[in-house]
Curated annotation (Swiss-Prot):
It catalyses: a (3S)-3-hydroxyacyl-CoA + NAD(+) = a 3-oxoacyl-CoA + NADH + H(+); a (3S)-3-hydroxyacyl-CoA = a (2E)-enoyl-CoA + H2O; a 4-saturated-(3S)-3-hydroxyacyl-CoA = a (3E)-enoyl-CoA + H2O; (3S)-3-hydroxybutanoyl-CoA = (3R)-3-hydroxybutanoyl-CoA. This is Fatty acid oxidation complex subunit alpha. GO terms for biological process: fatty acid beta-oxidation. Residues 1-190 are annotated as: Enoyl-CoA hydratase/isomerase. The record marks 120, 140 as: Important for catalytic activity.
Amino acid sequence: MIYQGKAITVKALESGIVELKFDLKGESVNKFNRLTLNELRQAVDAIQADASVKGVIVSSGKDVFIVGADITEFVDNFKLPEAELVAGNLEANRIFNAFEDLEVPTVAAISGIALGGGLEMCLAADYRVMSTSAKIGLPEVKLGIYPGFGGTVRLPRLIGSDNAIEWIAAGKENRAEDALKVGAVDAVVAPELLMAGALDLVKRAISGELDYKAKRQPKLEKLKLNAIEQMMAFETAKGFVAGQAGPNYPAPVEAIKTIQKAANFGRDKALEVEAAGFAKLAKTSVAESLIGLFLNDQELKRKAKAHDEIAHDAKQAAVLGAGIMGGGIAYQSAVKGTPILMKDIREEAIQLGLNEASKLLGNRVEKGRLTPAKMAEALNAIRPTLSYGDFANVDIVVEAVVENPKVKQAVLAEVETQVKDDAILASNTSTISINLLAKALKRPENFVGMHFFNPVHMMPLVEVIRGEKSSEVAVATTVAYAKKMGKNPIVVNDCPGFLVNRVLFPYFGGFAKLVSAGVDFVRIDKVMEKFGWPMGPAYLMDVVGIDTGHHGRDVMAEGFPDRMKDERRSAVDALYEANRLGQKNGKGFYAYETDKRGKPKKVADASVLDVLKPIVFEQREVTDEDIINWMMIPLCLETVRCLEDGIVETAAEADMGLVYGIGFPPFRGGALRYIDSIGVAEFVALADQYADLGPLYHPTAKLREMAKNGQRFFN
């Protein structure tokens, strides 16, 4: 053994060839933490000191190569002064440079996934051989930063600036055939032939058949583009990427600027440019929020995994109520491998559900994400039925009938008599109390809520609602089924609206107050979209459905009359009474036409102003900042109340619920991180400025206490 550490070993293979293997003890994946970087330095030193070494193969002892840097270390690192961050990056890059500058040929054998620093390690090698099942990429822009271990320097010099910009700015994982096509890897082999392929390459380099020094040289030099080519490549890319990323996500454009600035430099000077830009991005609030989001997501996965121990495996599912929602649930279950019965009392609803599932599967086939054979397999896994004949072997039933408590109670009581005693019943409800629905059941311990968001196939969140009598096994089994469906489940306790809708309706309440104060809803939409929401509140209400919003608001007002009940008519009342229901009937706040692709397209409709006129009670002068505060303060304060009331267990889950469930701007991190970014004391003072708008704007006593003590939601 030439070197042995806790993350890296170097051992002799044959004929002077050594294997530098990453295998971080106590972890399921390899990552570049402080320990691994330090050991890489020692391992490279050991190789340099051993005159018998003729070639090096870099490999992994795990199913994946290296997933990148240890993101948990970013939180403290990024608090350092900018100059220290630059120095730290340059120090790390000296290790990669030392590996790249070894006097012997080097080959990276890429298995599983090599992301971020993992791919940057491979780029420092002379040759790369990749398993057919492996994926590689530089996803750092998703964290608000860009590659900092030489990725912006080596990749464009290997595969050309256009390809490198596409890889870095998109942050996507790339398959083996695509990597080979652009020259990011030198060979692609079957997984079982990976080591043999790496050995073949290194032996050919040692023998002189391959000139590894010539292969290495372009990575050490400036980019091979003249001034005109540079201008065309970089200016065009910056314009396009800025349009794609938007103003709230600076990292993709900054990555292009860095490649451009470093284009005329050799490796070492180019790495200095990279380090300086990386440090600037690392200090932004966007990076802080997106890294926080990543860590929150890991916390969500950890909590969901904790349920596995007692969860029953749902081998056979059923959905009650077909149609669009039932069809979407059936599709999601079947395509992820759990066969499902789809029951309705009407043949036309069954057909609608099957059509929905078939359409979604067909779309995946068209996009190359599913083979026709897999589509047929998924369709066969959906069994339509008008009766309960096959329900005896069902492990979990998702009830997705109309949002009416009496109807749901009747259907749930009926299906309970048709399933085995330990089958789980889950109601897909957005607002109705799980405790109320449970009263109709003989086995309420087997009952939970399972709130899917529309459209089911696109929305990543599922709220699993624990009722007073729900057993931990019922909760765990439902969480496990949601995970099998490819969803991100969050367990919440029962209350009107659960987490997401309870928080969303105060936001809509702020919107209603603005419209009643004479503020143009189109202006409100523009301001909130600029703030970072995927769509403004008026457009969102049209998409959700004015009738759905009207019903939801009434449920919330009944549940929280002290702050959510408004005695005055609102914009939603006016539109509902005028039968302007949004996209579903072609007119709401906006009117809707069908575009060339058959999708609804919003257009202005002056007639809505007459409908809204009776509910405009005053004409207030408000700034864009006021609009944001009228909307965001109620949403944030209701999130705080949900955490304080124990509806959601952690701040991480609360924030991820809003990002996944209603499209809260990811670069702002979630409602509680947004409060942190303002400062808890500053947020309380801000809310107090709007206290005259009503109880939705009044901070809780506990939040005032946090403000007084200088506390945060995230440390």
